[in-house]
């Protein structure tokens, strides 16, 4: 299989440089944040309080809880970070529905006892990949946006220090760069399952989702190459491709999904290639 590409610096033309900077709290170790600012080519503000920042709309902010993406100014919503130990993902790890969870059903974990090799081609903050890894899947994750990649890498590092999470994180390998390039080079049957969750216009009104999507929209935008991702995924998956979509949204342009697993706000379109092993 091809080696993953690495891309840690924002493009020179990126407008993010005008709205995003890196800073840290008095309780955080500044070295990691300062190195990140250098790698990404972003302005370094040192110790600041996000609500007092006026020149930038967003901060990559390191505090005692880890790295976060934080809107600035008075009244800004709280930080967005990759968190697997506590909060929603911690509760889901301890009390989740096992292989009956929607993403696990879509990947096919109720149909096979074989450990699946899954490529999460659009990893984001890694929540679905963490669920699948907690159920035994060997996960390869790609996140091409360097800001989101930094958040996810930090979350996985912190989780690796937790006794309960460390075995799960050991089944997750994160790469930077574009999964589309990797899939186009990988060839047939490179992985068992490819999982896609492209960015889409989100209409969920819950406060958490709204906060996360507001910030993500500024940093990532939409994935305009979703149909290309699907085509490449179908060319390198052994058993199936799974695409997460809003429940009422149309399928990605291309072949029609053969099956769907639906939840309250989202669904999983399934593109089978061959039957999963028993």
UniProtKB/Swiss-Prot annotation:
Catalytic activity: guanosine(1516) in 16S rRNA + S-adenosyl-L-methionine = N(2)-methylguanosine(1516) in 16S rRNA + S-adenosyl-L-homocysteine + H(+)
Any single GO CC term annotated in Swiss-Prot or TrEMBL for this entry: cytoplasm
GO MF annotations in UniProt: rRNA (guanine-N2-)-methyltransferase activity
Subcellular location(s) per record: Cytoplasm
Domain of life: Bacteria
Enzyme Commission number, as recorded: 2.1.1.242
Residues reported to bind S-adenosyl-L-methionine: 143-144, 197
Predominant localisation class: cytoplasm
Stated family: Belongs to the methyltransferase superfamily. RsmJ family.
Job of this protein: Specifically methylates the guanosine in position 1516 of 16S rRNA.
Protein name: Ribosomal RNA small subunit methyltransferase J
Name of the gene this protein is made from: rsmJ
């Amino acid at each position: 299989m091809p080696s993953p590409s690495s891309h840690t610096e924002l493009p020179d033309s990126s407008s993010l440089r005008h709205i995003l900077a890196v800073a840290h709290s008095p309780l955080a170790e500044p070295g990691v944040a300062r190195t990140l600012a250098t790698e990404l080519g972003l302005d370094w503000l040192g110790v600041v309080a996000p609500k007092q920042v006026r020149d930038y709309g967003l901060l990559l902010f390191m505090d005692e809880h880890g790295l976060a993406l934080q809107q600035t100014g008075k009244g800004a919503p709280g930080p967005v970070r990759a968190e697997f130990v506590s909060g929603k993902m911690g509760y889901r790890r301890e009390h989740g529905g096992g292989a009956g969870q929607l993403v696990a059903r879509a990947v096919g974990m109720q149909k096979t006892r074989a450990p699946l090799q899954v490529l999460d081609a659009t990893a984001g903050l890694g929540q679905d990949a963490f669920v699948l890894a907690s159920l035994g899947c060997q996960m390869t994750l790609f996140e091409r946006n360097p800001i989101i990649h930094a958040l996810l890498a930090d979350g996985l590092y912190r989780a690796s220090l937790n006794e309960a999470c460390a075995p799960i994180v050991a089944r997750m390998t994160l790469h930077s760069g574009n999964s589309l390039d990797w899939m186009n080079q990988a060839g047939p049957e490179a992985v068992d399952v490819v999982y896609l969750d492209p960015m889409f216009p989100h209409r969920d009104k819950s406060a958490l989702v709204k906060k996360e999507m507001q910030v993500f929209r500024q940093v990532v935008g939409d994935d305009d190459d979703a149909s290309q991702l699907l085509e490449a995924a179908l060319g390198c998956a052994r058993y199936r491709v799974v695409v997460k979509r809003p429940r009422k949204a149309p399928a990605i342009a291309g072949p029609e999904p053969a099956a769907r697993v639906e939840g309250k706000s989202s669904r999983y379109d399934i593109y089978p290639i061959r039957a999963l092993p028993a």
